[in-house]
């Protein structure tokens, strides 16, 4: 399959999966799922689906719910997008968003610590300078 066609098909699958999970599923936990990426094999028989969920939601329960509905989801994707095969889906939790949020927080904390150190060093310099000017010759 040509790379551009594959990329377009993966985008269409990602949109369709999101729509199915939001509109067709009765399990409320699946309403909190975001499809972050999909990888379709060249023969279109296998589909790896990466998802994330809101912090505080039980990822393992959500993964189990996704596993229960993957046959239906696969069939709907194949039917809607007119694929030759209903791809075998494998769901994987994508922690990259969580890791990104943690990384941003760490960087912000480091920045705050640097600001505090700079403020302290400026205070020390001004204190040293004040002491020097108050000394008698």
Curated annotation (Swiss-Prot):
MF (Gene Ontology): ribosomal small subunit binding
Annotated InterPro entries: KH_dom-like_a/b, RbfA, RbfA_dom_sf, Ribosome-bd_factorA_CS
Cytoplasm is among the record's keywords: yes
Location of the region described as Disordered in the Swiss-Prot/TrEMBL record: 112-137
Gene Ontology CC: one annotated term: cytosol
Gene3D superfamilies reported in the protein's UniProt record: 3.30.300.20
Annotated GO biological process: maturation of SSU-rRNA
Cellular localization per UniProt: Cytoplasm
Biased composition (Basic and acidic residues): 127-137
Record keywords: Cytoplasm, Ribosome biogenesis
Family to which the UniProt record says this protein belongs: Belongs to the RbfA family.
Function per UniProt: One of several proteins that assist in the late maturation steps of the functional core of the 30S ribosomal subunit. Associates with free 30S ribosomal subunits (but not with 30S subunits that are part of 70S ribosomes or polysomes). Required for efficient processing of 16S rRNA. May interact with the 5'-terminal helix region of 16S rRNA.
Subunit structure of this chain's protein: Monomer. Binds 30S ribosomal subunits, but not 50S ribosomal subunits or 70S ribosomes.
Protein name: Ribosome-binding factor A
Species per Swiss-Prot/TrEMBL record: Coprothermobacter proteolyticus (strain ATCC 35245 / DSM 5265 / OCM 4 / BT)
Record gene name: rbfA
């Amino acid at each position: 399959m040509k790379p551009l066609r594959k990329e377009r098909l993966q985008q269409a699958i990602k949109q369709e999966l999101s729509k199915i999970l939001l509109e067709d599923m009765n399990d409320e936990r699946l309403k909190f799922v975001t499809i972050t990426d999909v990888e379709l094999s060249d023969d279109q028989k296998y589909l790896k689906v990466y998802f994330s969920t809101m912090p505080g939601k039980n990822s393992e329960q959500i993964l189990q719910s996704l596993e229960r509905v993957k046959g239906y989801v696969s069939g709907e994707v194949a039917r809607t997008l007119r694929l030759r095969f209903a791809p075998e889906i494998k769901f994987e939790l994508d922690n990259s968003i969580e890791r990104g949020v943690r990384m941003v927080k760490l960087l912000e904390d480091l920045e705050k610590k640097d600001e505090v150190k700079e403020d302290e060093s400026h205070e020390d310099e001004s204190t040293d300078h004040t002491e020097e000017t108050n000394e008698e010759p």
